[in-house]
């Protein structure tokens, strides 16, 4: 059962009915039942469920005993040992998976036995580490009810692709029991519809062209690679954003508000800013639980740069046990270090080129350049291997073939002209919406102030557009959410 499947939404409707029928104090039980059912339905075997159950039990038990250690029943040394044990048990399957993949792919050119690993491992492991660490530092109290703790870890809109939620942000929202609110329900539906549009009108369409080029990269060069790189940058963003948006919408049906995971990352004027806008829950987790514990920027520039390299290497390994992912992470570390070292000379050159800091043209140039750097890293990320990614980037610069824009070559890679037009218009709409939000305009508030006729006309038109021009429009099926594979 995936977030794009009809049974998923049938489950949501049944869950919502049960949730609002139950007394407020026990409404969280409806979420727990559905979360358990959903996780069981997406798991391939009982071994996965057993590993997942051990992780939940370890996280819950260690949280209780860490707190008791702070209350001087066991002492601080014991608390540290318990914290370490809880973290090791939580992340060991993840480390074994990623490092095992890295070893087997490098040496034997085979993949590890990923079939035994629990679904959502990369996300709930980080959530557990944050939970235990925050208890140790006294930021939160441990959850004493194991069923409530289980709900925190397994909450079904989050378990596959996040966002990675902290207990102090999510915990009480899950357990308090929210009142039924028509407006809240409609706000949730708005987000779900917007998520569908991002997925079916942009991400899935872009995937067709992207797959055609990346799967046969040896025969393409020049603008073919550039366009595929741009479209993959858009595909990955809208695919992940759509899943998070749908998750936020589903959660709002129950009165639960999830943290945002993106803030228009391709409007960034530097790589540093990009990581403040991209996958924000992961960026915050890496900052708080890897970068800062390593010393952050408090111990001189050399140590700061080493900490950045380690942090981004961890980020790369988190995405997968392949050298291409680690190189992708290290490349972003290099971008940040180079950006900081070269900031003054670059600023001097741009000032001399009549591009003063703060000017619109300067911002545009920096946005384009940052997006180009990010796109090159995404090519490595998407390619079948590090070697293939490097070859694609070389091929992109090896030939200038502008004629493909006019001889219909682009329309022979899975997308006809009409599909390209739909994709272009959908990206244009996303860009316009993002630009308005960037200026502080709250589109949903404006929308909710309109009369019922206008609102329902937009709802029905959105569904019609998705139905005609999205998944069903030209005979192709929805692809899996990309980040579900990490």
Per-segment meaning from a language model:
Residues 1-431, 435-485:
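Membrane-embedded transmembrane alpha-helical bundles that form the catalytic cores
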């Amino acid at each position: 059962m995936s977030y794009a499947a009809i049974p998923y939404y049938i489950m949501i409707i049944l869950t919502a009915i049960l949730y609002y029928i139950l007394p407020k104090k026990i409404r969280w039980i409806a979420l727990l039942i559905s979360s358990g059912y959903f996780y069981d339905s997406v798991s391939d075997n009982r071994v996965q469920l057993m590993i997942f159950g051990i992780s939940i039990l370890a996280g819950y038990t260690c949280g209780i005993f860490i707190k008791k250690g702070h209350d001087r029943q066991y002492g601080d040394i014991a608390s540290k040992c318990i914290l370490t044990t809880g973290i090791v048990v939580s992340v060991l399957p993840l480390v074994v998976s990623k490092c095992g993949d890295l070893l087997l792919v490098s040496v034997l050119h085979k993949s590890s036995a990923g079939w035994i690993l629990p679904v959502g491992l990369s996300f709930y492991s980080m959530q557990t580490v944050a939970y235990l660490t925050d208890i140790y530092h006294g930021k939160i109290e441990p959850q004493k009810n194991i069923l409530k703790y289980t709900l925190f870890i397994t909450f079904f809109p989050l378990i596959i692709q996040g966002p990675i939620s902290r207990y102090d942000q999510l915990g009480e929202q899950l357990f308090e029991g929210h009142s039924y609110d028509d407006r809240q329900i409609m706000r949730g539906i708005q987000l779900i519809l917007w998520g569908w549009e991002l997925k079916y009108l942009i991400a899935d369409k872009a995937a067709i062209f992207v797959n055609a080029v990346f799967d046969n990269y040896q025969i393409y060069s020049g603008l073919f690679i550039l366009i595929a790189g741009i479209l993959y940058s858009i595909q990955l963003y809208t695919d992940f954003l759509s899943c998070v948006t749908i998750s936020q919408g589903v959660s709002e049906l129950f009165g639960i508000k999830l943290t945002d995971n993106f803030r228009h990352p391709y409007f960034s004027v530097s790589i540093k800013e990009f990581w403040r806008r991209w996958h924000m829950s992961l960026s915050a987790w890496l900052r708080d639980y890897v970068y800062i514990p390593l010393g952050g920027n408090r111990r001189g520039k050399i140590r700061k740069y080493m900490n950045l390299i380690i942090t981004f290497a961890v980020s790369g390994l988190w995405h997968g046990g392949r050298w291409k992912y680690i190189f992708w992470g290290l490349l972003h570390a290099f971008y940040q270090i180079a950006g900081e070292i070269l900031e003054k000379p670059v600023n001097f050159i741009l000032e001399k080129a009549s591009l003063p800091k703060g000017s619109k043209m300067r911002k545009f140039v920096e946005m384009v350049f940052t997006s180009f750097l990010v796109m090159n890293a995404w090519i490595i990320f998407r390619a079948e291997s590090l070697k293939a990614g490097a070859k694609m980037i070389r091929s992109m610069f090896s030939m200038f073939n502008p004629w493909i824009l006019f001889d219909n070559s682009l329309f022979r890679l899975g997308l006809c002209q009409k599909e390209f037009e739909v994709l272009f218009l959908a990206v244009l709409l996303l860009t316009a919406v993002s630009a308005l939000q960037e200026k502080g305009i709250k589109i949903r508030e404006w929308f909710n102030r309109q009369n019922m006729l206008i609102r329902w006309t937009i709802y029905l038109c959105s569904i019609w557009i998705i139905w005609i021009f999205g998944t069903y429009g030209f005979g192709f099926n929805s692809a899996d959410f990309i980040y579900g594979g990490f």
